[in-house]
């Protein structure tokens, strides 16, 4: 299973299309701040969540999905105040038995872990702060492990990665 996660494209589909033209994905999740017509995302197979600009009532604020026995959370993060701390997101994740939480909003790619829950920000696919190039995340899952790579959306070079064994060790 291969999953794409991107965030904060802010009106640009160029980088997303570049990734989609070079990889095949079983699922695609967008973490908000799309600023494009929702039908343009639907025709690309994107499952989206609300961002903070612009507000779109057609999207959920938080999307919780169980995929191959792993509980994922997909959220923009602004309602969890992720710009300041991961505490609210961590408490929400614990309450909902989340294994891996993906969030956006900050435009900064990062991987964190707290008490066995992984917090992944894929960065911004079109307006990055850190690193200085557009990024997205690719999840590759099999029966024993979950490999998550944050990649440059243009060159596909790996910026950060983590391998999580399904028995809970990384």
Question: Where is each model-derived feature located?
Answer:
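Active-site neighborhood of phospho(di)ester-bond hydrolases with catalytic His/Asp-centered motifs
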Residues: 5-7, 27-33, 47-52, 73-76, ...
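Binuclear metal-dependent phosphoesterase catalytic core
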Residues: 15-18, 67-68, 96, 120-170
């Amino acid at each position: 299973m291969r999953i794409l996660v991107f965030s904060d494209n802010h009106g640009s589909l160029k980088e997303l299309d570049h990734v989609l033209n070079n990889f095949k994905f079983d699922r695609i999740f967008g973490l908000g701040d799309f600023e494009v017509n929702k039908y343009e995302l639907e025709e690309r197979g994107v499952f989206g969540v609300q961002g903070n600009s612009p507000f779109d009532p057609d999207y959920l604020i938080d999307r919780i999905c169980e995929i191959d026995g792993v509980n994922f959370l997909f959220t923009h993060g602004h309602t969890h105040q992720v710009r300041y701390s991961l505490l609210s997101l961590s408490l929400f994740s614990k309450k909902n038995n989340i294994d891996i939480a993906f969030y956006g909003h900050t435009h900064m790619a990062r991987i964190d872990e707290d008490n066995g829950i992984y917090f992944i920000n894929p960065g911004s696919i079109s307006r990055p702060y850190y690193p200085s190039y557009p990024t997205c995340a690719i999840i590759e899952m099999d029966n024993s492990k979950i490999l998550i790579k944050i990649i440059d959306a243009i060159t596909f070079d790996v910026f950060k990665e983590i391998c999580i064994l399904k028995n809970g060790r990384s």
